[in-house]
Regions:
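Alpha-helical structural signal in soluble globular domains
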Residues: 47, 51-56, 80, 84, ...
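Short, solvent-exposed alpha-helical surface patches in well-structured domains
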Residues: 15, 47, 139, 218-222, ...
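Active-site beta->alpha loop and helix N-cap motifs at the rims of alpha/beta catalytic domains
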Residues: 1-131, 268
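Catalytic alpha/beta core domains of metabolic enzymes, predominantly
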Residues: 113, 125-235
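Structured C-terminal cap/extension of enzyme domains
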Residues: 181-298
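A general structural signal for well-ordered alpha-helical segments in protein cores
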Residues: 13, 45, 49, 74, ...
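Short Gly/charged-rich anion-binding patches and loops
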Residues: 15, 76, 106-107, 135-136, ...
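Short, amphipathic alpha-helical "lid/cap" segments that border enzyme active or binding sites
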Residues: 10, 14-17, 134, 273-283
């Protein structure tokens, strides 16, 4: 989280990590898309990672986002993650560069060969303007350190195809908390969700625990609650209904009394009182009850 003046808010970050642990999440991803890695300095990114590992070590697995414009930069962040005891690393293909599928494979191969940590491939077409094909994901699964794929394409059919192609080889994280997702997991073993900000954790954690325990009726109950939250806040392409995704998320967290902090430029804060009231009403309808409906500055 950032303070209102744009500085890194270390105390809020520690409090947020403790909140995630209280929610019994199964892992924490640091410096991903929601973590605004693009507006942090290298020193800040390393500090954020160090705090997360120190706060959660031994309790919750910590994966560090290494997103950057070059493989060399990713390697440096990956080496730092290994040195502080992180459990794994994640990155998208380089943004803006529009690499080919062969270039995507070469990029991940460089990272996998250089950093001795479990590696998660992050497919995020909306943020990178490239979509990693299933064939390329199959090739990447052959790299020794690649253990998982985070598919944020928003394409449910492709996620199902990815799960089928990678079953028994690497884990696949996508959007599975719905009836179709349950069917995909039952058939191919999708591993879970990685949600920005953890707003859905009160519904997502018990959903997966019920599913893994074989209690499908209870899983469907939690799924319905989670789906309601998503429908109220998120569009099918992972854009958000009330503001840009991270601005909306942080405003929602503040409304709920959570230490979400503020965004940094180029993102703008969600401050319009009428929009905040609508966001607060959506949270309340989803079963997450705001502490305040007057503003998002708590």
């Amino acid at each position: 989280p950032f303070a209102a003046d744009g500085s890194l808010d270390e105390s809020a970050w520690r409090a947020l990590l403790r909140l995630y642990a209280e929610h019994r999440v199964h892992g924490v991803l640091v410096n991903g898309t929601t973590g605004e890695w693009f507006s942090q300095t290298p020193e800040e990114r390393r500090r954020v990672a160090e705090i997360a590992v120190a706060e959660l070590s031994g309790r919750v697995p910590v994966v560090i986002g290494c997103g950057a414009f070059t493989a060399a930069e990713c390697v440096r962040y990956g080496e730092h993650a290994r040195s502080i005891g992180a459990d794994g690393i994640l990155t998208t293909p380089p943004p803006y560069a529009h690499p080919s599928q062969e270039e995507i494979y070469a990029f991940y191969r460089t990272l996998a060969e250089a950093v001795d940590l479990p590696l998660m491939v992050y497919n995020w077409p909306r943020g990178t303007a490239v979509d990693i094909t299933v064939d390329t994901l199959v090739r990447l699964a052959g790299l020794d350190t690649v253990v998982a794929v985070k598919d944020s394409s928003g394409d449910e059919l492709k996620v199902a195809d990815t799960c089928a192609a990678l079953a028994g080889r690497v884990q696949v994280f996508g959007r599975f908390i719905h009836r179709r997702g349950m069917a995909v997991m039952a058939e191919f073993g999708g591993a879970g969700n990685i949600d920005g900000g953890g707003l859905g954790a009160p519904f997502a954690v018990p959903f997966y625990e019920a599913f893994w325990a074989g209690d499908m009726d209870l899983a469907r109950e939690w799924s319905a609650r989670y789906e309601r939250l998503v429908a109220l806040l998120v569009n099918g392409d992972y854009s958000s209904r009330f503001a840009s995704p991270t601005s909306q998320l942080k405003a929602a967290m503040r409304l709920l009394g959570q230490p979400g902090g503020h965004v940094r430029p180029p993102l703008l804060p969600l401050e319009d009182p009428s929009v905040l009231l609508r966001l607060s009403a959506a949270l309340d309808e989803a079963g997450l009850h705001p502490c305040s409906t007057s503003n998002g500055n708590r």
